[in-house]
UniProtKB/Swiss-Prot annotation:
Its EC number is 6.3.2.2. GO terms for biological process: modified amino acid biosynthetic process. This is Putative glutamate--cysteine ligase 2. InterPro entries: GCL_type2/YbdK_subfam, GCS2, Gln_synth/guanido_kin_cat_dom, YbdK.
Length: 378
């Protein structure tokens, strides 16, 4: 289907954005999960309380920014929300930790006492009780739902690159898994998580979701956990592929790249460009490679189907979105933050560096993660 806009289209230079960050609540000594989410949420006040959410574990919280227009504003909100949540966690005897997967054994795996969570637990059994995982979800405003579905199609070739940039979960049960994002591996056990299928239209998308619900694969449309989707709750495209980022600047970098990428491909859709129909097996393999290697090895260039050095594809992505970044005033910030990640490594690389330096002391990694999670005082 060729997208035919009803209007001149959205102002692609000023797309709004918002970010959801999920965090673990861990014991400072053992690193084990602590089921104190209710106390942490009760300890928040004002804007932070209004922007907090209960999650799928008693040992998790989610902080959600409001709808925003620029990256500087986003950074200020993320700093404030992380600081408030870290303070509330400490008051509850825990530490707020931004990491994609539970790094040590999780003993508390019960879901909160909410009907929907209990229904998921009954339907999916042990999968619903896997160790907790945390993601970073970026929303970009696109009120035209038909356009949003086509944008999802166009984003698919680039999402493994975004996934690799965010990789921040190499540890599981106190051991290095050999994967940069163990979260991605763990989530594959759910039937409605993974690369987003190609859809011809919004009607095609809705019919597919309805069929999956009727087939018992999902409880409701809220269980569409594909890596990118038209949001079920907001007039946005929601990119869900990434691990939660270790630092505020890592999160803002990803949000800036994603918004510019959405603006770039939305312009292509508006001009009549068709998204490539990538074979599902190749798309899944590209995401596996991103989760395994992060930015330390090769990624699959889905434009050619061949492996290329990961940073070459990051450079290609940056070049692709540079015009959008310039229109949004974000080019210098994103360029500088990519240079920092190139020098320091992804969150997974940073964790492994601490693990090597500390003779495999996982507590040293947890100290590092907690320090990275809490923004430095201004």
């Amino acid at each position: 289907m060729t997208y035919r806009p009803a209007t001149d289209g959205p102002d692609l230079a000023s797309l709004t954005l918002g970010v959801e960050e999920e965090f673990l609540l861990l014991d400072a000594e053992t690193g084990e999960s602590m089921p104190v989410a209710a106390r942490v949420l009760d300890g928040l006040s004002g804007v932070a309380h209004a922007q907090s959410r209960r999650e799928f574990r008693h040992s998790m919280v989610e902080m959600v920014t409001p709808v925003l227009s620029d990256l500087a504003e986003l950074r200020r909100h993320l700093v404030a929300l992380r600081t408030a949540a870290a303070d509330a966690a400490e008051a509850a005897g825990a530490r707020l930790v931004a990491v994609g997967a539970t790094p040590v054994n999780e003993t508390h795996r019960t879901v909160p006492d909410e009907p929907r969570y209990h229904a998921m637990s009954r339907r999916f059994g042990p999968v619903a009780h896997d160790p907790a995982v945390c993601g970073c979800h970026v929303h970009v405003g696109l009120p035209d739902r038909e356009l949003a579905v086509q944008v999802c199609n166009h984003l698919r070739p680039w999402l493994p690159v975004v996934q690799a940039i965010t990789a921040n979960s190499p540890l599981h049960d106190g051991q290095d898994t050999g994967h940069a994002s163990w979260r991605a591996m763990q989530l594959e056990r759910w039937p409605s998580i993974g690369p987003t299928p190609y859809f011809d239209s919004a009607a095609d998308y809705d019919a597919t979701v309805a069929d999956l619900i009727k087939a018992g694969i999902m409880l409701d449309a809220g269980m569409v956990y594909w890596y990118v989707r038209p949001s079920a709750a907001y007039p946005t495209v929601e990119i869900r592929v990434g691990d939660v980022c270790p630092t505020v600047d890592d999160t803002v970098l990803v949000a800036g790249l994603v918004r510019a990428l959405v603006a770039t491909v939305a312009a292509d859709v508006h001009d009549g460009a068709r998204a490539p129909r990538i074979r599902g097996c190749l798309l899944s393999a590209a995401h596996w490679r991103a989760a395994h290697d992060g930015l330390d090895g090769d990624l699959v260039d889905l434009r050619t189907g061949r492996a290329r050095p990961a940073w070459d594809l990051v450079d290609d992505l940056f070049a692709l979105v540079t015009p959008a970044l310039e229109r949004q005033g974000d080019r210098a910030y994103v360029r500088d933050q990519l240079a920092r990640v190139r020098a320091e490594g992804t969150g997974a690389v940073r964790q492994r560096r601490i693990l090597d330096r500390s003779a495999c002391d996982v507590r040293a990694v947890l100290d590092h993660l907690a320090a990275q999670t809490r923004p430095a005082p201004v």
